[in-house]
A protein has these predicted regions:
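Active-site anion/phosphate-binding pocket segments in diverse small-molecule metabolic enzymes
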Residues: 2-163
């Protein structure tokens, strides 16, 4: 397995398969591997809700000030764990953008108020998993393991393989 590959001389004349290490993960904080999986969500819509409106399931987020919201095209039907709400903020360059409301079946909503419109015109996707927030981070936030996160991604997600 992946962990056995890093035992070096302890497995002399043995064969080991990489397993999850192929994707940049191993259950040992002393072993640093590069992240190989990124997840980007397309910005489907930008909305300017009225003060007092609510967002998401159970109306858990209430608009209290002038706000620019982005509706992102990924949800729990795609395998995105609902516990990503614990993360609270995504990053776009130097900007932190809060997740508002709950992850829904097909979308999540983020507060884009701090992002200049010029930058929004240049981007069409928001990173959810990348080098700054890896699957390992998401697994920790969701009290699970990276295997569960990776195997939950659904068929609706477009996969791009880079050589």
């Amino acid at each position: 397995n992946s962990h056995g590959m890093f035992l070096k001389n302890k497995l002399k004349d043995e064969v080991s398969r990489p397993g999850i290490a192929l994707y940049g993960y191993v259950n040992d904080d002393k072993i640093n591997l590069d992240n190989t999986i990124n997840l980007y969500a397309p910005i489907l819509q930008i909305r300017y809700p009225n003060i007092g409106e609510t967002v998401g399931y159970d109306a858990i987020y209430k608009i209290t000030k002038k706000t620019k919201l982005g509706v992102l095209g990924v949800g729990y039907a795609d395998g995105l764990k609902r516990c990503i709400n614990k993360r609270k903020k995504l990053k776009v360059g130097e900007f932190s953008i809060p997740i508002v409301g709950r992850v829904s079946m097909d979308t999540i909503v983020v507060d884009l108020s701090l992002i200049p419109n010029k930058l929004l015109d240049e981007i069409n996707h928001i990173p959810l998993i990348d080098n700054k927030y890896s699957i390992k981070n998401m697994a920790k936030d969701c009290s699970t393991i990276p295997y569960e996160i990776m195997t939950s991604f659904g068929k609706r997600l477009k996969k791009v393989y880079i050589k």
